């Protein structure tokens, strides 16, 4: 299947969108991933023979800054994305191991899946912040990342440190080369996977499709 992603443009007319949806269908596009929700737009999309999916950030959740400040990921320097995000101000990533995070996200996506004319949901930012950016972006931030720097390496919050120590007997903050420790790498990968599993089960139980942007 072929898909397109788009932001909802309030300045475009209904006729503009109908023409665009028809063109997408003619070009062999299967569906549209929308950033945002507009019931009429989703309905028109489906009337054109396309699937309509709701695209949304997963681990990057600034709406929780005041409600659950403890849920945010912490880097190797002890800095939280709650008040000191990496790279850009909107990088407010959650820690997947905090109790309540996975359930909150699953409930949020199910609410989206329940919306009229929504065929499925698409998960983006299903990860921790970039520990190393592409070389082409280094100059944008005035950095050089020839190795993993502690200020971009997450999550070293108390919950993650405790859980990892229970599993391995080691504190991740005491690892000499955390970037090469496979058990520490897998610990964080598995934490993200468990969140995705919970979201997936909840959305599929509602009879809707789910996909993700893998980085």
Where are these regions (language model features)?
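Boundary/entry segment of secreted carbohydrate-active catalytic domains
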Residues: 1-20
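Hydrophobic faces of well-ordered beta-strands that scaffold small-molecule active sites
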Residues: 2-6, 32-34, 52-56, 121-124, ...
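The substrate-binding groove and active-site-proximal loops of carbohydrate-active enzymes
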Residues: 5-11, 28-35, 87-104, 178-193
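Active-site beta-loop-alpha junctions enriched in small/polar residues
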Residues: 7-9, 37, 57-59, 126-128, ...
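Catalytic domains of carbohydrate-active enzymes, especially glycoside hydrolases
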Residues: 14-40, 115-118
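Aromatic-lined carbohydrate-recognition surfaces of secreted/lumenal glycan-active proteins
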Residues: 53, 122, 126, 178-215
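Active-site-adjacent "subsite" loops/lids of carbohydrate-active enzymes
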Residues: 53-116, 133
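Active-site-proximal loop/short-helix segments
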Residues: 122-180
């Amino acid at each position: 299947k072929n898909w397109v992603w788009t932001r909802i443009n309030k300045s475009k007319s209904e006729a503009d969108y109908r023409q665009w949806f028809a063109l997408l269908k003619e070009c062999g596009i299967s569906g549209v991933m929308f950033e945002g929700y507009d019931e009429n737009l989703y309905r028109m999309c489906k009337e054109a023979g396309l699937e309509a999916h709701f695209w949304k950030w997963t681990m990057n959740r600034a709406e929780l800054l005041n409600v659950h400040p403890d849920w945010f990921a912490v880097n190797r320097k002890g800095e939280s994305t709650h008040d000191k995000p990496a790279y850009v101000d909107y990088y407010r990533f959650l820690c997947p191991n905090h109790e309540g995070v996975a359930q909150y996200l699953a409930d949020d996506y199910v609410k989206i899946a329940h919306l009229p004319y929504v065929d499925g949901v698409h998960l983006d930012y299903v990860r921790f912040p970039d520990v190393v950016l592409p070389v082409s972006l280094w100059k944008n931030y005035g950095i050089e990342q020839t190795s993993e720097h502690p200020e971009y390496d997450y999550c070293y919050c108390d919950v993650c440190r405790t859980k990892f120590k229970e599993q391995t007997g080691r504190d991740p903050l005491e690892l000499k080369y955390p970037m090469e420790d496979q058990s520490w790498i897998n610990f964080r990968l598995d934490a993200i996977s468990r969140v995705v599993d919970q979201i997936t089960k909840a959305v599929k139980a509602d009879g809707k499709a789910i996909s993700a942007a893998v980085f």
